[in-house]
Amino acid sequence: MPFIVKIKKQLALYELTVDLETEAGILAVIGGSGSGKSMTLKCIAGIETPDSGFISLNGRVLYDSSKKINLPPQKRNVGYLFQEYALFPTMTAAENISIVMKQKNPVQVQKWLEEYGLGDYADSYPDHLSGGQKQRLAMIRMLAAEPQCILLDEPFSALDEHIKRKMEREVMEMLHDFDKPILFVSHNQEEVYRLADRIGSMENGRFSPIREKRAFFAEPQTVGQAKLVGCNNISEIDWISEDRVYAKDWNLSLRVPFTE
């Protein structure tokens, strides 16, 4: 069943307006800093409350302003990977995982730790782990809770460049068999192109219609989208004939060929 988010929330600079529907696979939400990406995830997770709207996951209503339904985060069954990982600092790696499990299983916890290269760190605290190890632990903990969808909030932004690609591959391997919706927030167009199946953009709190990623990059629909995919040479134009335009910012006349 689809994952549906139709919400509005008044923020200081704009009104957040999100209307999306997605199913299994990775949907990227790309946008600049302050565009509303992270706030959208927080509303879905129940950390923030929209002013109005509706959120349902797998046929289960998480939020409905008209019916005064607003499930707390722990009852939404949504996995959320924060930029800062949000590990419990006074718990060991093994304890960070077992605390979210519906049925405690120390053998399974150790199996996960070993599978993802943390077998020797079961009794270590987060402060004693590297950035990459913390991210792996946060991913294991998130999956151990058996979520019905996953929210990834700039998951690689805190990592050094030389390990970022390695962690991308590791995260994708960990999510390979997760056949439920994944919302992946990023401002990095290369990251989005490598990892996502479909893309929607955020501009001043407004979420654009979802498109297949190749179409999104090949034919951006707004100036904002064009900048997000790396197009920097943008100019206002005036049509001067059927097949010619005048680019105001470049002081150039250009031919625009038409194709049937």
Name each model feature, range by range.
Residues G53-S65:
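Conserved ABC transporter NBD signature motif
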Residues Q83, T92-G224:
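ABC ATPase nucleotide-binding domains
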Residues S38-L41, L137:
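ABC ATPase nucleotide-binding domain helices that frame the ATP-binding cleft
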Residues L62-G79, P220:
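ABC ATPase NBD coupling module
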Residues Q221-E260:
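ATPase nucleotide-binding modules
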Residues L27-V29:
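Short beta-strand immediately N-terminal to the Walker A/P-loop
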Residues G32-G36:
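Walker A (P-loop) phosphate-binding loop of ABC-type ATPase nucleotide-binding domains
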Residues A45:
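Helix-to-loop junction immediately C-terminal to a conserved catalytic motif
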